[in-house]
């Protein structure tokens, strides 16, 4: 729970001005025990947003986040102005520099990405994109270029399939 942030905080301690730090929030992993692969509850309300950010800042050993991301927001979240007013307030307080939407697996999510670029002050959209999974990436990349919104690619190696380490003899 927050292990990656703790590790990043330790590794880059004393080097804050030399790195760009991005993290994301929405899943309430601190107050819920995860059982299996069931999705954890998502929260974007102001109280949770502030608490999640405070905890991330502590784990990352910094006083601000360069790019703060909404993790897998659904369309109803993109349309919720309160969420983005909270994030704009955090920019005003100097706790984050900008924010993004970090979208889920490649199937679907096109509308969420486009709506975020069209209607909200996002600086970037994070999406799955690789030679095997180009939807919705192609459309989001095109729209991002039109709107001057950055695209952050995740899973560029198709979860290891494109590394050459997975072959017909690999047991899954």
Regions found by a protein language model. Give the residues of each.
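Alpha-helix N-cap and loop-to-helix initiation/capping positions
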Residues: 3, 7, 40-48, 75-82
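A short, structured active-site edge motif that brings together acidic residues
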Residues: 18-30, 127
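Beta/alpha (TIM)-barrel catalytic core signal, keyed to glycine-rich beta->alpha loops juxtaposed to Asp/Glu
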Residues: 11, 73-172
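Surface-exposed, active-site-proximal loop segments in enzymatic domains
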Residues: 30-43
């Amino acid at each position: 729970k927050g292990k990656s942030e703790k590790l990043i905080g330790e590794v880059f301690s004393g080097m804050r001005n030399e790195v760009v730090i991005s993290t994301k929030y929405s899943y309430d992993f601190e107050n819920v025990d995860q059982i299996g692969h069931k999705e954890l509850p998502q929260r974007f309300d102001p109280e949770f947003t502030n608490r999640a950010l405070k905890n991330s800042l502590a784990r990352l050993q910094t006083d601000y986040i360069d790019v703060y991301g909404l993790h897998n927001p659904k369309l109803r979240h993109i349309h919720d102005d309160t969420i983005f007013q909270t994030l704009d307030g955090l920019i005003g307080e100097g706790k984050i520099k900008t924010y993004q939407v970090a979208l889920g697996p490649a199937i679907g999510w096109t509308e969420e990405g486009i709506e975020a670029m069209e209607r909200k002050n996002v600086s970037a959209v994070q999406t799955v994109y690789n030679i095997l999974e180009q939807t919705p990436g192609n459309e989001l990349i095109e729209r991002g270029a039109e709107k001057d919104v950055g695209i952050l690619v995740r899973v560029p190696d198709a979860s290891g399939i494109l590394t050459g380490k997975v072959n017909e003899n690999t047991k899954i």
